[in-house]
Amino acid sequence: MAGRGGSQLERRRERTPDRGRGSASHPPGRESPSPPPLPLKRHTYRRVVSDQEEEIVVVSENSRSPSPQEQPPPPQQPPKKKPRKTKHVPLQDVSQDSEDEREAEEELGAVGFSYPPVRITGKDGKRSFETLNENDPLTKAASAKMAVTNPLSLPIVSAWEKGMEIMNMLMERYRVESDLKSNFQLMPEQGEVYRRICHLYINEEHRGIPLTFTSNKTLTTMMGRFLQGFVHAHSQIAHKNWESTGCALWLHGCTEVEGKLRCLHGTTMIQKEHMIEMDVASENGQRALKENPDRAKVTQNRWGRSVVQLANNDARCCVHDAGCATNQFSSKSCGVFFTEGAKAQQAFKQLEAFMKAMYPGMNADQAQVMLIPLHCDCNHKPGCVPTMGRQTCKMTPFGMANAEDLDVDGITDATVLASVKHPALMVFQCCNPVYRNSRAQNAGPNCDFKISAPDLLGALQLTRKLWTDSFPDTLLPKLLIPEFKWLAKYQFRNVSLPAGHAETSRQNPFDF
């Protein structure tokens, strides 16, 4: 019995199945393992002596009652696994709680504008949706704050849209014609719209503005170019191979040494004898007789016609034109030629004194910088092919008659004194004005571009005033005019490049 008792203490226990295959109370239906073997019985012999006899008793080791000191430790039992507890997810309370209780329990993510309204909440990284009543305070707050954004009222981010916004305001303000306004797309070749805006501005704000050797059309044309440059600078539009103003800042250095002039190459111009013959009835012939009575005379040419012959011993030309005849230029020439070197230097001094009078803070180096137009109306279009003749505007010094007779002491305006002390102005004309009256069939293009250096500077000032008058709350953008640097593309061209004529109806030129 003792052996059976020991075996009962070490009886087999149920094995807990693996996770996911059941619990201890419901083991899976599989064959149970065999019980471990019973320990071997060890017999001991004990001698029992009584008063009359001696008896040997066989006592089993398992049946001995050990002493308290010799009691073996209880067998170690395997640790019991704690049963898994099933988590019951509480159902969402759909009762109508107060607004404070909702904010305390969950974080409100949004309130949709659907019908019926939906309350979107987020908690522990999860989103839940709840249908709200129309009278709920959250619904009223969402209807007031969550308005649908109109796409047409989004902030302007495109450069083209910024430029079109400015131009639409200008065209509306100065009442530009409807056909120009409807076809305007902020393209580089649409300079006529800018010129029209400046023309209307001059007629309204500065009617009767005094000009010297400058046509009204050229003044508004240059103002339109500057306005286009301001619009492009404001909208951050940049062109790779085209400059909207068509101008450059030229450090001429023609006033440093008396009697020394420089051409566009930056080299010193050479002195050359020059003889001019003009028709007696022409405007140039009459002007030569009035301005230079000591050097101009009326004679007969080799064909027997009466002409005004003007001899210039102080003519200046480019170094590359030293071996060329009168009005002839080499292929390396810059096209700069002055019939009177002293008058040309006087014109440069006049502009320098004129700018110092308007801007007293200028230093000597800044006063020698001259704003010059490089392109006239003939070659200002983007992608224009070089034509025959001069590639830059022609510079001609014009003398101001009767300016020397004015009393210097009676004039207080410093800008006027600059012209009195230096009675000559540098005038910029078409690149090739000689083609205007030419009867040759292969004559190049020409235009009536004509503006003096002081009026060109005045065109820039008027354009700035137009911007500030039209947009008082908008900062005047910074207009970037490049510094002049001599390039091979400015060379005089004696031969025009061949140009093709589009013929879209044929794929083969020899398809007769």
From Swiss-Prot:
Keywords: DNA replication, DNA-binding, Early protein, Host nucleus, Host-virus interaction, Metal-binding, Phosphoprotein, Viral DNA replication, Zinc. Zn(2+) 2 binds at C376, C378, C430, C447. It is found in: Host nucleus. Residues 495-512 are annotated as: C-terminal arm, DBP binding. GO terms for biological process: DNA replication; DNA-templated transcription; positive regulation of DNA replication; viral DNA genome replication; viral DNA strand displacement replication. Residues 69-78 have a biased composition (Pro residues). Residues 276-310 are annotated as: Flexible loop. Residues 1-105 are annotated as: Disordered. Residues 79-88 have a biased composition (Basic residues). GO terms for cellular component: host cell nucleus; viral capsid. Residues 96-105 have a biased composition (Acidic residues). Zn(2+) 1 binds at C263, H265, C318, C334. Residues 9-21 have a biased composition (Basic and acidic residues). The modification Phosphotyrosine is found at Y174. InterPro entries: Ad_DBP_C_sf, ADBP_zn-bd_sf, Adenovirus_DNA-bd_a, Adenovirus_DNA-bd_N_sf, Adenovirus_DNA-bd_zn-bd, ADV_DNB2. One of its GO terms (molecular function) is zinc ion binding. The keyword Metal-binding applies. Its main location: host cell. The C-terminal arm bridges DBP molecules together, thereby creating a chain. Plays a role in the elongation phase of viral strand displacement replication by unwinding the template in an ATP-independent fashion, employing its capacity to form multimers. Also enhances the rate of initiation. Released from template upon second strand synthesis. Assembles in complex with viral pTP, viral pol, host NFIA and host POU2F1/OCT1 on viral origin of replication. Covers the whole ssDNA genome during synthesis. The complementary strand synthesis induces its relese from DNA template. May inhibit cellular transcription mediated by the interaction between host SRCAP and CBP. Belongs to the adenoviridae E2A DNA-binding protein family. This is DNA-binding protein. It comes from Human adenovirus E serotype 4 (HAdV-4). The gene is DBP.
